[in-house]
């Protein structure tokens, strides 16, 4: 291999790495959007259940149905955490809790909201 071939391979490798980095960033942004939407829908669903007075989960009885799993009731503190996250603060466990996110999304914080 001469220098030109090595240089061309390095250039192609750099282009591939840049493309992978771009695609990874896009996937991360999409995952964050989906988790945020899921959390918002869960909170909205919980609030609607409270308004309707339907706190008990609905189950469908069938001959082959398994016993329903216990559904966690959402804690009112989760709403407060969602508000804090919306204002730009970390709510994830550990050293970052309470620190400003500087406009960046945090998958750990979103995991706390989705639990």
Curated annotation (Swiss-Prot):
The keyword Transmembrane does not apply. Pfam families: YabA. The keyword Cell division does not apply. It comes from the Bacteria. Keywords: Cytoplasm, DNA replication, DNA replication inhibitor, Metal-binding, Zinc. It is found in: Cytoplasm, Nucleoid. Its cofactor is Zn(2+). Binds 1 zinc ion per subunit. GO terms for biological process: DNA replication. Zn(2+) binds at residues 90, 92, 106, 109. One of its GO terms (cellular component) is nucleoid. Involved in control of chromosome replication initiation. Inhibits the cooperative binding of DnaA to the oriC region, thus negatively regulating initiation of chromosome replication. Inhibits the ability of DnaA-ATP to form a helix on DNA; does not disassemble preformed DnaA-DNA helices. Decreases the residence time of DnaA on the chromosome at its binding sites (oriC, replication forks and promoter-binding sites). Tethers DnaA to the replication machinery via the DNA polymerase beta sliding clamp subunit (dnaN). Homotetramer. Interacts with both DnaA and DnaN, acting as a bridge between these two proteins. Belongs to the YabA family. This is Replication initiation control protein YabA.
């Amino acid at each position: 291999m001469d220098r030109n071939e090595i240089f061309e391979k390095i250039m192609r490798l750099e282009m591939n790495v840049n493309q992978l980095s771009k695609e990874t960033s896009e996937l991360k942004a999409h995952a964050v959007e989906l988790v945020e939407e899921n959390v918002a829908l869960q909170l909205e669903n919980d609030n609607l259940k409270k308004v309707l007075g339907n706190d008990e989960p609905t189950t469908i009885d069938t001959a082959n149905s398994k016993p329903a799993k216990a559904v966690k009731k959402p804690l009112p503190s989760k709403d407060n955490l969602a508000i804090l996250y919306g204002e730009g603060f970390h709510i994830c466990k550990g050293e970052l809790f309470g620190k400003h996110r500087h406009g960046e999304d945090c998958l750990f914080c979103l995991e706390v909201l989705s639990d």
